[in-house]
Amino acid sequence: NYPAIKKWISHNREYYMTKDYIITKDKYGDWCVPPESLEMIHSQDPARKTDGALIATAYYLKVLQLMHRFASLQGLTADAKEWEDLEHKMKDAFNAHFLHIKEGTSLVPGHTLYPDSVFYGNNTVTANILPLAFGLVPKAHIKEVAKNAVTTIITTNKGHISTGVIGTQWLMRELSRRGHTDVAYLLATNDTYPSWGYMAAQGATTIWELWNGDTANPGMNSGNHVMLLGDLLPWCFNNLAGIRADRWKSGYKHIVFQPAFEIQELSNVDASYMSIYGKITSRWKKTPMHLEWDIELPANTTG
């Protein structure tokens, strides 16, 4: 509903945007991150929680990107320019406010210094994943920001999930997009807390509301709450099976196939998706010496 979203943009700009183009309104933040104690519902550790203004501003920028595209498709030239201009101003403000570049050090006089660490906010996985996923990171810093997200996952969190509802929506596909499908696969197959596999190992047949749903205070602890599934299933179809829609063609009219053959621990995938044109299938298996891949496309589509 383009007119309604337009009103939403105006409302938030009027009431919740600072003169420096930062959105301050946020209620839940990265809801339900794994807490520091198994009995807790919500973490109180500042190191685990992502700045609500970072989340709100990043999502406002994402909406502007979508609205620019929607306006362009409808031929609304003036609107498209308005969204694009505001996006550019907010993107610069976002990086000025949230991007941190810690300079390197050297004892050699005149030595060229490269950034020692580049990250957003307080360097949570969510704080780094959102700018990456929304195209907000300056090109020169993309690899460093992605590296910090991976380092936090592997080193700080020992290969475990640390994101809540917001970060988990983009986590898996963005890791793969940045060349870290192996890290995404580690998260997908981990069966110790906190992880999806841990839920299954404890007998869960649906997704819990909390990563620690088996131990947390029952005051807010649904056993059937799909929100923490995040983008795990889209990642399975888009990246493991490699079934993706061409974003510039409507409804899988053109299909992009690009499976994650590179995952050493994964030897076979069999997936199908019922699109509006019909069934799309990607089925592959491999050995160290052989790869076999079958795909099926519906009539009146290309791939």
Predicted regions and their residues:
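Non-catalytic C-terminal accessory modules of carbohydrate-active enzymes
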Residues: 182-303
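Active-site-proximal structural scaffolding
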Residues: 5, 53, 63, 87, ...
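Extracellular polysaccharide-recognition and catalytic grooves
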Residues: 101, 119-222
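Generic hydrophobic alpha-helical scaffold/packing signal
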Residues: 9, 84, 91, 150, ...
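Hydrophobic alpha-helical scaffolding
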Residues: 50-57, 84, 117-121, 158-161, ...
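Well-ordered alpha-helical scaffold segments within catalytic/enzyme domains
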Residues: 1, 59-77, 129-140, 169-179, ...
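Charged/polar, low-hydrophobicity segments characteristic of intrinsically disordered regions
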Residues: 15-27, 96-107, 112, 160-176, ...
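Active-site acid/base region of carbohydrate-active enzymes
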Residues: 1-56, 71-130, 140, 190, ...
